[in-house]
Amino acid sequence: SDFARLLAIQVVDWLHDLEKSEIGFELFSLVEIGPGEGTLSRDLILAVGEIAPALISKIEIVLVELNAGMRERQEKVVNKLEGVNYRWSNIDDLISSPVTGVIVANEVLDAFPVERLVFTQNKVFRQGVSLRRKNDDYYLEFVDLMPTSLIMNFLNDSNSLLKIEFPPKDICNRWVTEWHCDLPNWFKKLSNVLSNGSLLVVDYAMESKRYYSANRKDGTLISYRNQEANSNLLKDAGLCDLTAHLCIESTINYALTNGWSFMGETRQGQALLALGLSGFLYSLQNTDINNLSAALNRRESLLRLVDPMGLGDFRWLAFQKSNNDDLILGKRFLEEPTS
């Protein structure tokens, strides 16, 4: 995919930077957390091979997948790769044998569990779900629970460390928002997985002033079934995917307090343009007339990647882990777009 080809340009930069730093290692690891069908890992390693063939023998792909059914599907994709080192693992096993390289988490964190918080009459509640019975029918409904000490710590720390006001001024009654409660531990674990290298998070995210705006009265949590969004989170419970945006400042703070340094963040559209997407578009001008249909389809998919109303609004957040003070990783994805 073109997405993988462009991302590979940044990945190759990082691997070359690690190579120059003369850090001792057996193989560089290209780790994908939650690899889906396995197509991104496959396309990434193929693109790395095109850009820097000498690196292929020095790299292993590590797919971190907990679901046995998904792993079987990934095997069908990745097993077709020739001359490539690859394996499946989990975070705990990687902690016991840390790696050097690049970790990619593409559309992973938006699916993490969240605590849902309800603000009403100067009080905050933890939102719970209760199973109720009416006649012979059972149904789910939201209930207000007392907040845990962890929730109160989150609210206090957000205020004191990040200057995020809870609740914001002029909220409606029963203003709702989310807290990504599993992020601190995730960053902590990953900092023990990686000895030296980078972590790239690609996901739905927004600044705290938008995330915790009085106008965003229902939070960011949304339900998807068959690619259709629904704000009724209890409809078809158990059959839907639930996703919630990340708060950029909170996410960065959790990384900084759990072993990472912050390299920078940008919108996906800007990142891909910086990595040369416009050059990909330009090359389509020389398409043979017989391949016009394929070229137009490719042009559409490239433009979708940078569409500010869609995929282009994804955020790229990059973090560095280093046990070597001399390690400097480049940030081509943050540079001014190339023409």
Which functions belong to the PLM regions below?
Residues 92-94, 98-121, 173-181, 185, ...:
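A short SAM/SAH-binding and catalytic strip from SAM-dependent methyltransferases
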Residues 158-339:
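Long, Lys/Arg- and hydrophobic-enriched amphipathic alpha-helices
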Residues 29, 60, 87-88, 100-102, ...:
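Beta-sheet entry/capping signal
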Residues 10, 86-91, 101, 185-187, ...:
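Short alpha-helical segments and helix-capping/turn motifs at coil-helix boundaries
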Residues 31-33, 64, 103-106, 202:
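Active-site flanking residues adjacent to catalytic metal/cofactor-binding acidic residues
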Residues 68, 109, 206:
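Short, glycine/acidic-enriched loop or turn micro-motifs at the edges of active sites
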Residues 102-156, 214-224:
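A mobile, often basic/glycine-rich helix-loop segment
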Residues 2-95, 322:
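SAM cofactor-binding core of SAM-dependent methyltransferases
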